[in-house]
Amino acid sequence: FFELDMQFHSSIIDASANTPLIETHTQYNRRLFRARFVSSRMRLRRAQTLSQHQQITDALMARDKERTAAGLRGHVRSAVENIKFAFETDQNSTQINEEDKL
C-alpha cells in the first residue's frame, strides 16, 4: 500500500511539470518518509485514503479546480491526523512493551 500511495502522489506532482512543486515534494518526502510509512500501516484508514485518492483523480480528470483543491485540502488534513494518530499509537505500544519488560 505504501508504495502505491507514494506512486499516486508522485504521479500527480510529476504530471504538473511544476519544478518548484516537484522540488518541494521531494524535500517533503525526505523529511516525512518515516511518518508516512508508519501512517500507511494503519489498515483502518486505507479505505478513507483510497476514497480520497479517487475523489482527487475524478476532480483532476474533470479539470475541476475547486473540487481538486477541496479534495487535496481534505486529504492533507486527514494525512496529518493519520500521522499524529500513528505516532501516538506507536509510542503507546512501545511504552507498553517497555513496561512489560520491567
Whereabouts are the PLM-identified features?
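Conserved amphipathic alpha-helical segments that form helical-bundle/coiled-coil interaction surfaces
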Residues: 1-38, 49-59, 67-77
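Short alpha-helical linear motifs
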Residues: 26, 46-53, 90-99
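Solvent-exposed loop and edge beta-strand segments that line ligand/cofactor-binding
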Residues: 41, 45
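C-terminal effector-binding regulatory domain of bacterial HTH transcription factors
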Residues: 65-102
